[in-house]
């Protein structure tokens, strides 16, 4: 799989800014595997094959199992995800689909139960970046 545009070559400053954001997010204490699940779920919703290919490899490198990756699009019914992961996935879906609905208060409240304010900002920035 290849991207249509080589963003690093076409806009190196913008690419470096995104790398800076990624570095910041990874320094906020969120688990690497959680971040990859979030990126994969947003990519599933967005139908981005290139992103799914890249982030499934990154998720495996972060310790994710094949079974959890295969069932990610059915995470609500699958028993393999923790309450924290479920809160992150619900937050990811709500933000990714924000044009269709506002983020429900219940989704926000559940996310706040599992994530500090700093972690939720990092999670939000991850979703914003993958959706950009």
Task: Go through each PLM region and give its residues.
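Hydrophobic alpha-helical segments
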Residues: 1-132
């Amino acid at each position: 799989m290849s991207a249509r545009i080589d963003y690093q070559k076409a806009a190196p400053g913008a690419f470096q800014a995104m790398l800076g954001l990624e570095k910041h997010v990874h320094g906020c204490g969120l688990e690497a595997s959680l971040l990859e699940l979030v990126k994969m779920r947003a990519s599933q919703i967005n139908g981005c094959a290139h992103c799914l290919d890249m982030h499934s490899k990154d998720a495996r490198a972060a310790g994710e199992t094949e079974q959890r990756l295969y069932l990610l699009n059915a995470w609500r019914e699958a028993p393999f995800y923790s309450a924290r992961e479920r809160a992150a996935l619900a937050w990811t879906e709500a933000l990714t689909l924000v044009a269709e609905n506002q983020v429900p208060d219940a989704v926000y409240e559940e996310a706040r139960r599992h994530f500090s304010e700093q972690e939720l900002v990092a999670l939000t920035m991850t979703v914003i970046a993958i959706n950009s």
